[in-house]
Amino acid sequence: MPDWLAQLLITLLKAVLVAFALLTTFAYMTLIERRLLARMQIRVGPNRVGPLGLLQPLADAIKSIFKEDLRVTLADKLVYTLAPIVAIGMALTAFGGIPAGPPKSLFGTDPWVYNLDAGILALLALTSMGVYGIFLGGWASGSKYPILGGLRSSAQMISYELGMGLSILGLLMLVGSTSFLRIVEWQALNGWLILFQLLGFALFLVSSFAETNRTPFDLPEAEQELVAGYLTEYSAIKWALFQMAEYVNMITASAVMATLFFGGYRGPVFLEGLIPGISGWPLIWLILKIACFLFLFIWVRATLPRLRYDQLMRFGWKLVLPVALANTLLTAAFLAFGRGAGLWLLGLLSLAGLLLLFALSDRVRALWNTPTQRRGAETAWVRPLGGDG
């Protein structure tokens, strides 16, 4: 067998395995999320299908497959059908570039589907293209609520994609590469990048919630405002494909944060000298880090209310983008003038920037209000109880 054909078959096999792992994780993520939300809300949650409710994802899958696939009269049939395929296709493709271990550690092959020198840029491009599935699904439905949800998704993606890119630009300048593998190797030598880019991580985390359309940024499908947003006219397997795309994007965002800021598939450096062979558990470390971020996504959904649309846009353009730009300039200044002082200085500066944001939290909160609300807050007086003013 020619080498190129063998390599192609191996790549296809790895792609199938990654897709299977992601879709299986999605299925049980829905169950875990429902059970955790129920526990946080003092409920029981789904526990009737199978032992301890573990077959609930299978029941949901069977139900979605065999439900009637309704078609809207005014819908564009081709685009209406292709939109969920585009969404899930981009989500699955984006995850394939994230390394799950060192080179040649997966039965003599590389533990990734593809490895690009511009890996992080390719991933940002793929995740950005996923919004086309949402927008096209809303537009093709031929209904006002879906098109509003699609437009919201497009505006939200544009607003937070810039901040997300700038939030990791300082990290990329520090490492000197856009390859995921080299970023992990750099952290093995110098320490996790969360220590030196704390402000960038906070901005990337917020942008990840917005990019995945999760609470408090789930405006494209706001039930109280848009029925179900871009999902209003979808049912059966098409609706399930959109849900798959959302959860796969959550998993991808968690894997990216683990890789960029927490050492990726490598365990904590201080443990490598204490526990023999700990560096031989790359996949386990990556899964544990992804699980922590997925729990954070669920926790935030159970805790925070949804932002208004004007608050969402104002927060992205007036806070996330300027602070991300400031973090980039701070890192550039350190590389130009303070490199000799050591990386700890950059970590302290990043921590100081984050603490400054918390200290100015009242000013930050004012960005969420409209000009009329801000003027009202400035001129308000405490009125006596029961008085007319």
Swiss-Prot record:
Keywords: Cell membrane, Membrane, NAD, Quinone, Translocase, Transmembrane, Transmembrane helix, Ubiquinone
Membrane topology according to the record: Multi-pass membrane protein
Annotated EC: 7.1.1.-
Principal subcellular localisation of the protein: membrane
Subunit composition and interactions: NDH-1 is composed of 15 different subunits. Subunits NuoA, H, J, K, L, M, N constitute the membrane sector of the complex.
Role of this protein: NDH-1 shuttles electrons from NADH, via FMN and iron-sulfur (Fe-S) centers, to quinones in the respiratory chain. The immediate electron acceptor for the enzyme in this species is believed to be ubiquinone. Couples the redox reaction to proton translocation (for every two electrons transferred, four hydrogen ions are translocated across the cytoplasmic membrane), and thus conserves the redox energy in a proton gradient. This subunit may bind ubiquinone.
Family of the protein in this entry: Belongs to the complex I subunit 1 family.
Protein name: NADH-quinone oxidoreductase subunit H
Protein source organism: Deinococcus geothermalis (strain DSM 11300 / CIP 105573 / AG-3a)
Lineage: Bacteria, Thermotogati, Deinococcota, Deinococci, Deinococcales
Gene that produces this protein: nuoH
